């Protein structure tokens, strides 16, 4: 009897012990994916940024930890993909413009975990190319892109996040991105670097100024402030930023052709005879009988930049724009985009390296050589010159030198950093505004998205 009772008690105890364990194991299995889901939301965030530039469209996918430190995606610090031409090339076919982004959208969805896509913000910033389209062409393209994102993507986006990026936004994002990568954000403004971003349609200058300079800042003629107050990495900055529309590298060519009163242009290489198309307008490209001249090209470029335009304030750059007053925030300068690209084609920059120290005078010296060379011989001297840039090499080099020296007031022998990428930890990160946009977007939207989704 005792043995039977013992056996019965043993069975009851076994059932009693096993039952909670089985229930507990079911609860654990149910919580594991939930816990993983919550942890991933708390510890990492993604942002998808489309850069719809004048020469092409690019997508950047960034991954951040909870402190907005960049985390790798695969073997790289970001996912990047590009396509050509830019959206503005589809001015008469908005749907084709939107469809040109499909490969980029597919690529982004391939790297962001599916469970995070609904709370991953997506923003498209169109820059100078779309700004210059006439009528409602730009808005029709943007609406087609909004429809694409809404119908074919699971990313979190809003109509106002697919828009033409204001030039000052572009400049401030670039400044934030480069200073973030250099580890300058959070430090005194004197430790930050100025940025000059020479795009295709516009050029942006941005740098931090003192409180004293901020107090004296004049009002821009268009009503927009010259200075933005930014709070980044627990530090307040007075950020001078201005975007010069129509003064990017490609738009600058058009301005120089407009400034020429003759059919021939002293900036065109000898042997050139054709047309340059920009913004829906064709410009005659023909060198004078004596060939191009760097001196006459420089005079024409100064005229195109409106260097001598009336300045109603204390100090101006060009075209009557306030220069920000200078100061320690402009002591160091990082110049990007076409400054690197053109510099690489004439040997100022070695493309084996993500950046290089250079001086404005080097662009002038290269121009002196290019301007006295026949279009058929330019490759023998500058073999890395892209074929599409050959007719304009003299013009481009003179333009960049004049922009830096006469426009922004740099000493011809001042050493600046010309960059394509920035070394960040063990990675190279592209010097572009999308990173600054991503930092701003993630920090301002992540909590809102979570609350709305819960």
UniProtKB/Swiss-Prot annotation:
Main location: membrane
Keyword S-adenosyl-L-methionine: no
A single GO molecular function term of this UniProt record: ATP binding
One of the GO biological process terms: nucleoside diphosphate catabolic process
Keywords, comma-separated and alphabetical: ATP-binding, Calcium, Glycoprotein, Hydrolase, Membrane, Nucleotide-binding, Signal-anchor, Transmembrane, Transmembrane helix
Essential cofactor(s): Ca(2+)
Principal EC category: hydrolase
Post-translational modification remark: The N-terminus is blocked.
Localization, UniProt: Membrane
Intervals, Cytoplasmic compartment: 1-7
Function: Catalyzes the hydrolysis of phosphoanhydride bonds of nucleoside tri- and di-phosphates.
Name of the protein this chain belongs to: Apyrase
């Amino acid at each position: 009897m005792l043995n039977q009772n013992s056996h019965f008690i043993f069975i009851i105890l076994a059932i009693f012990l096993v039952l909670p364990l089985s229930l507990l194991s079911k609860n654990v299995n149910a919580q594991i994916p939930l816990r993983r889901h919550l942890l991933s939301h708390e510890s990492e965030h993604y942002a998808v940024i489309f850069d719809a530039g004048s020469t092409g469209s690019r997508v950047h996918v960034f991954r951040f930890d909870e402190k907005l430190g960049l985390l790798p995606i695969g073997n790289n610090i970001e996912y990047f993909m590009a396509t050509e031409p830019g959206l503005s090339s589809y001015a008469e076919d908005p749907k084709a413009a939107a469809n040109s982004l499909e490969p980029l959208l597919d690529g982004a969805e391939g790297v962001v975990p599916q469970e995070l896509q609904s709370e991953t913000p997506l923003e498209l910033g169109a820059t100078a190319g779309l700004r210059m389209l006439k009528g409602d062409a730009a808005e029709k393209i943007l609406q087609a892109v909004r429809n694409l994102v809404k119908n074919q993507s699971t990313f979190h986006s809003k109509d106002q996040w697919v828009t033409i990026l204001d030039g000052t936004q572009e400049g401030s994002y670039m400044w934030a991105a480069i200073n973030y990568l250099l580890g300058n954000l959070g430090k005194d403004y004197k430790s930050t670097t100025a940025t000059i971003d020479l795009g295709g349609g516009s050029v942006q200058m941005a740098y931090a100024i003192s409180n004293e300079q901020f107090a004296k800042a004049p009002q821009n003629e268009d009503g927009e402030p010259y200075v933005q107050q930014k709070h980044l990495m627990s530090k307040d900055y007075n950020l001078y930023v201005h975007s010069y529309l129509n003064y990017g590298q490609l738009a600058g060519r058009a301005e120089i052709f407009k400034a020429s009163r003759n059919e021939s242009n002293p900036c065109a290489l000898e042997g050139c005879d054709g047309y340059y198309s920009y913004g829906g307008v064709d410009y005659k490209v023909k060198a004078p009988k004596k060939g191009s001249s760097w001196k006459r090209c420089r005079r024409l470029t100064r005229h195109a930049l409106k260097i001598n335009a009336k300045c109603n304030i204390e100090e101006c750059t060009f075209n009557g724009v306030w220069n920000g007053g200078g100061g320690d925030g402009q002591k160091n300068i990082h110049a990007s985009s076409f400054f690197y690209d053109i510099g690489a084609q004439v040997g100022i920059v070695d493309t084996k390296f993500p950046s290089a120290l250079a001086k404005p005078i080097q662009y002038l010296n290269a121009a002196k050589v290019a301007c006295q060379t026949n279009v058929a011989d330019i490759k023998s001297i500058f073999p890395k010159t892209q074929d599409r840039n050959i007719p304009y090499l003299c013009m481009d080099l003179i333009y960049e030198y004049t922009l830096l020296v006469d426009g922004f007031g740099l000493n011809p022998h001042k050493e600046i950093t010309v960059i394509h990428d920035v070394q960040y930890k063990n990675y190279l990160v592209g010097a572009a505004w999308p990173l600054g946009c991503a930092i701003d977007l993630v920090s301002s939207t992540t909590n809102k998205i979570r609350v709305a989704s819960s």
